[in-house]
A protein has these predicted regions:
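Carbohydrate-active catalytic/glycan-binding domains of CAZyme proteins
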Residues: 1-318
Length: 318
């Protein structure tokens, strides 16, 4: 089946898809043309609010825009750049985990809470303690434990940190050095803080060797976790090589063995996604810049069916 542009009426990106109460919800970032010039630190991505979309027929049905669910002006600690977000449910409450810059220009992760998946979400006064960087994915395992995956290089500031501590000088690994990994931390029972210090998400090849910094399939940003037949599928963007890739592990922390490319480079610099099952069918949600004629900060949501082969490998999405 041909891919669908999910919401042509507006520019949105970085979709996080979740199923709540039998309906599929997509939590994207919200692009607009701020007039900022393109730069490698993402200054042209000046998103300032979040919407949520919902539907009960992914490929052909009506998509409802529930409007603004959180605005940067309502977040006490955040100044600008409401980048990626995700939502998880626990005990009838909905927790939106999002990334934004504080008044010192530093990215952190925040929490906002709602009584229903379409919001509105009420933000906490402060970001998650010890949080940094961008691109949160919140994954609820079968035992009810909730994990937050996060991290992004360059504009996402992951190179500013090592062992969860800020560096005096940023470090971007090169060549055969180990790359900068995504991070994962279990959340507290109230989904307000990290329950532990974040751990590196290690991606290895079939021989158990860490993919090096110069491998075009190494992690860059856009962590996503889903579970399929008891295995943990960690997927991610490779950033400057523009792939969506995935790796598979036996537990939420990994290590994860690299398996392959899900999506080849699209029109536009970034590629960011989520993977979700709804009504027995798996889907890949992502974005590209075809409708905006390759204006990289004006992206459009897209969805396509996703399939596995008989060995549980994800088939590339065309």
């Amino acid at each position: 089946m041909k891919a669908r542009y999910l919401f042509p009426k507006d520019y949105m990106a970085d979709p996080s898809a979740n199923v709540f109460n039998g309906r599929l919800y997509v939590y994207p970032s919200h692009d607009w043309d701020s007039g900022e010039c393109f730069d490698d630190d993402g200054g042209h991505f000046q998103m300032k609010d979040y919407h949520v979309l919902s539907m009960d027929d992914v490929m052909e049905g009506e998509v409802t825009d529930h409007g603004v669910i959180l605005d940067v002006k309502d977040v006490p600690w955040a100044e600008k750049q409401m980048w990626d977000n995700d939502v998880v449910e626990k005990d009838g409450k909905y927790y939106l985990i999002f990334s934004a810059k504080d008044y010192n220009g530093v990215f952190h992760l925040g929490v906002a809470v709602a009584d229903q998946p379409e919001g509105p979400f009420i933000p906490n006064a402060d970001p998650i303690r010890k949080s940094y960087s961008i691109d949160p994915c919140v994954f609820k395992d079968d035992d009810g434990k909730i994990y937050c995956y996060f991290g992004g290089i360059w504009g996402g500031q992951l190179q500013w940190y090592k062992d969860n501590k800020a560096l005096k000088c940023e470090h971007l690994p090169e060549g055969k050095e180990d790359p900068l990994p995504s991070r994962v931390a279990m959340m507290t029972d109230d989904v307000q803080q990290f329950a532990e210090m974040p751990k590196p998400v290690v991606i290895v090849d079939e021989n158990g060797k860490i993919l090096p910094a110069d491998d075009p399939h190494r992690f860059f940003e856009a962590s996503w976790m889903h579970k399929y037949k008891g295995k943990y599928y960690f997927s991610y963007s490779t950033g400057d090589s523009h792939y969506l890739c995935y790796a598979v592990g036996d537990n939420p922390y990994g290590p994860f063995t690299y398996k392959g490319v899900i999506l080849e480079p699209v029109v536009g610099w970034t590629t960011h996604h989520s993977i979700c099952e709804y009504k027995g069918q798996w889907y890949l949600f992502h974005h590209d810049c075809v409708p905006s004629k390759d204006t990289t900060w004006l992206r459009s949501l897209k969805v396509a069916p996703l399939y596995y082969d008989e060995e549980d490998n994800i088939l590339p999405v065309k």
